[in-house]
Amino acid sequence: MMVIRPVERSDVSALMQLASKTGGGLTSLPANEATLSARIERAIKTWQGELPKSEQGYVFVLEDSETGTVAGICAIEVAVGLNDPWYNYRVGTLVHASKELNVYNALPTLFLSNDHTGSSELCTLFLDPDWRKEGNGYLLSKSRFMFMAAFRDKFNDKVVAEMRGVIDEHGYSPFWQSLGKRFFSMDFSRADFLCGTGQKAFIAELMPKHPIYTHFLSQEAQDVIGQVHPQTAPARAVLEKEGFRYRNYIDIFDGGPTLECDIDRVRAIRKSRLVEVAEGQPAQGDFPACLVANENYHHFRVVLVRTDPATERLILTAAQLDALKCHAGDRVRLVRLCAEEKTA
């Protein structure tokens, strides 16, 4: 059974294996053991209530409960940009016009922005390619909404998610090549690694401070503004069906889109509800897949179950109850996996 649980110190080697499969561009999952260990430690301290809000971040893993294999990772940053500035570009417009010459030009322009400061962030979503089946991607991504719904007071009103931009298998980013490299004088992979390992001071020191006309970029770079990496397209679709939208903010490195949504308008958060759980043999039938989560902050668990999402009393097997760390009579959070039945 596939189960979402909080990360543990013993997961570091599994996270290193996952990091080696990302193909680059996933800044928050670098193949660096010291950085990953520090990330795990920060998550543990967040759960223990030892960190200020500006440093809090939760990390979860997707585990096969039968084999102990860690198949994926996802995370939530509680409030971005309160310690280090959180940069992106806002894609806007500057108008240059002359009535005398009968000239009017509306030029797409990139404006450096810290507009999302303080927002909660969905991040570090990666599923091992070998496990991209049977709804695992949906479970991994949407499990975070169950945690946010259960512990709403831990998070801010707006949620953002940076989507990985277009980058090829050799680490070539058209957007970086045309813009970032001119100011940072390093390859995309180097800048990505520095940022992922927490060495972010160079961003504020070197990045351009003035608006940038996109027409000055290569056509290849212009074409990838707001576009996602092919492997990230499914993750974008998942978030958009939950209510997230692209509001013309992009990543400063690869030009990938930043999606955003008011937390209380996220479908899975808004429609999730608490039901009593009982042990038994679940009813047979053509039921949709549903997310089921316990309400245990320190021992949070989420699984996928096929059931009636409108039920008031959820019947689970002993194995499912054990995976959820629940007992008969407990209340669990339930929501349909998708607005319409899908298979990952």
UniProtKB/Swiss-Prot annotation:
SUPFAM superfamilies for the chain: Acyl-CoA N-acyltransferases (Nat)
Keyword annotations: Acyltransferase, Arginine metabolism, Stress response, Transferase
Induction, per UniProt: By nitrogen starvation, and arginine. Induced at stationary phase by sigma S.
Residues forming the catalytic site: H229
Catalytic reaction annotation: succinyl-CoA + L-arginine = N(2)-succinyl-L-arginine + CoA + H(+)
InterPro entries, sorted: Acyl_CoA_acyltransferase (IPR016181), Arg_succinylTrfase_AstA/AruG (IPR007041), Arginine_N-succinylTrfase (IPR017650)
GO MF annotations in UniProt: arginine N-succinyltransferase activity; N-succinylarginine dihydrolase activity
UniProt EC number: 2.3.1.109
UniProt-listed Gene3D superfamilies: 2.40.40.20, 3.40.630.30
A biological-process GO annotation: arginine catabolic process to succinate
Binding site for succinyl-CoA: L125
Pathway entry: Amino-acid degradation; L-arginine degradation via AST pathway; L-glutamate and succinate from L-arginine: step 1/5
Protein function: Catalyzes the transfer of succinyl-CoA to arginine to produce N(2)-succinylarginine.
Similarity section: Belongs to the arginine N-succinyltransferase family.
PANTHER family, A to Z: ARGININE N-SUCCINYLTRANSFERASE, N-SUCCINYLARGININE DIHYDROLASE
Listed name of the protein: Arginine N-succinyltransferase
Taxonomic placement: Bacteria, Pseudomonadati, Pseudomonadota, Gammaproteobacteria, Enterobacterales
Recorded name of the encoding gene: astA
